[in-house]
Amino acid sequence: MAPAKKGGEKKKGRSAINEVVTREYTINIHKRIHGVGFKKRAPRALKEIRKFAMKEMGTPDVRIDTRLNKAVWAKGIRNVPYRIRVRLSRKRNEDEDSPNKLYTLVTYVPVTTFKNLQTVNVDEN
C-alpha cells in the first residue's frame, strides 16, 4: 500500500478538464473493431472514435467532422483503415442553454505514414 498523505497536504488546483486544448492522436481502429461483422465495421469504427474522444477529453458532447467520416468510409463499410490520425479539440460551447460547457471536435489529419508519431499538443492559432 502507498503511504498515507498527511492531512494538510491537499492541493487546491482547478481541473485540467475545464481548459480548452487541442491534441493530435493516432487511433488504432483495427484493434477496436476486431471481430465485428462486415456490415457494422465502419459504423462501429465511428462509435469507437467517439468513445476514444470522450475518454481522452472528458466531454460527453463529441462532434465528428465530415472529412473524418469520409476518411473512415473511404474504402467502404467493410474495409476500414487500420489506423487514423485525428485532432481532438476541446472547445467552449457557445450555445447558452446546453447542459455541457465544453465539447470535443474530432477532425481528420491526413498523414503518409504512422511510423514514429506521438501524441502532440497543438497550439491554438
From Swiss-Prot:
A molecular function GO annotation: structural constituent of ribosome
Q: Its principal location?
A: cytoplasm
Keyword terms of this UniProt record: Acetylation, Cytoplasm, Phosphoprotein, Ribonucleoprotein, Ribosomal protein
Do you know which SUPFAM superfamilies this protein is assigned to? Ribosomal protein L31e
Look up keyword Phosphoprotein and say if it applies.
yes
The protein's location, in the record's own words, is: Cytoplasm
Please indicate if the UniProt record lists Ribonucleoprotein as a keyword.
yes
The N-acetylmethionine modification is found at: M1
Q: Which GO terms describe its cellular component?
A: cytoplasm; cytosol; cytosolic large ribosomal subunit; cytosolic ribosome; extracellular exosome; focal adhesion; membrane; nucleoplasm
Q: Which residues carry this modification: Phosphoserine?
A: S15, S98
Q: Which GO terms describe its biological process?
A: cytoplasmic translation; translation
Instruction: Output the superkingdom of the source species.
Output: Eukaryota
- What Gene3D superfamilies does this protein map onto? 3.10.440.10
In terms of InterPro entries, this protein maps to: Ribosomal_eL31, Ribosomal_eL31_CS, Ribosomal_eL31_dom_sf
Where does the record place the modification N6-succinyllysine?
K55, K70, K75
Which cysteines pair up through disulfides? They are: none
One of the Pfam families matching this protein, by short name: Ribosomal_L31e
Modified sites of kind N6-acetyllysine: K75
* Subunit: Component of the large ribosomal subunit.
Physiological role: Component of the large ribosomal subunit. The ribosome is a large ribonucleoprotein complex responsible for the synthesis of proteins in the cell.
| Similarity comment text for this entry | Belongs to the eukaryotic ribosomal protein eL31 family.
Name this polypeptide is given:
Large ribosomal subunit protein eL31
What does the organism's lineage look like at the top? Eukaryota, Metazoa, Chordata, Craniata, Vertebrata
